[in-house]
């Protein structure tokens, strides 16, 4: 941009110099024309003097001596006049040559002036094109800066969501471990209850065999059986609840893994878009 401005200033300076040279050439031309006019006037005056001398020579040709002297004087004047005429002709020729050179300089100056004006016009058009491109580039950079800020915000949101999902996953994994421990504990208790049920069943069979002997204890045994049955149902209910909890947690883990995968894909896409925007800004 500074180089173009310097070039514009140089072209303007060349234009001003060309105008000055053109004005100087015009002044030289006018001065040469004035000198040529003066020399032509002097030539006409000398021609008039020569004619007067010739007339005077004719007038006094009748007087031999005077005529001879006057003739010699007239011839001398004529010779001087011819010399003056020749000198004037040479001066006129020099003035004409100087006038031709001045006209050539004027034509050269005018041509340079025209070329300088064309170059200045082209430079102005180039400046306008460059300014338009610079304005478009600035607008594009502003848009890319806005897009970059938005991409950074999106990336930051994605990072926060990713961290939140990771924390949730850690919590769920911990809950899953505890649920698995409770399920194992429930399974152990179920096994114990099954063993206890078998023992109770065996005892019940033994009691049934001795029912007649121990009929007075029947109510007590029935109550024990009911209590044991309730404990068995409770254990089975707890085992079913543990199984449903494990199933629900497994589904939650699957959903979170899907969400985590989707967030990773989104984060990857945002990172690629951000890299692309940074590459565009770097290339600019």
Swiss-Prot record:
Phosphorylated at Ser-283 by DAPK1 in response to oxidative stress and this phosphorylation enhances stress fiber formation in endothelial cells. Its main location: cytoplasm. The modification Phosphoserine is found at residues 45, 174, 186, 206, 252, 271, 283. One of its GO terms (cellular component) is cytoplasm. Keywords: Acetylation, Actin-binding, Coiled coil, Cytoplasm, Cytoskeleton, Muscle protein, Phosphoprotein. SUPFAM superfamilies: Tropomyosin. The keyword Coiled coil applies. This is Tropomyosin alpha-1 chain. The gene is TPM1.
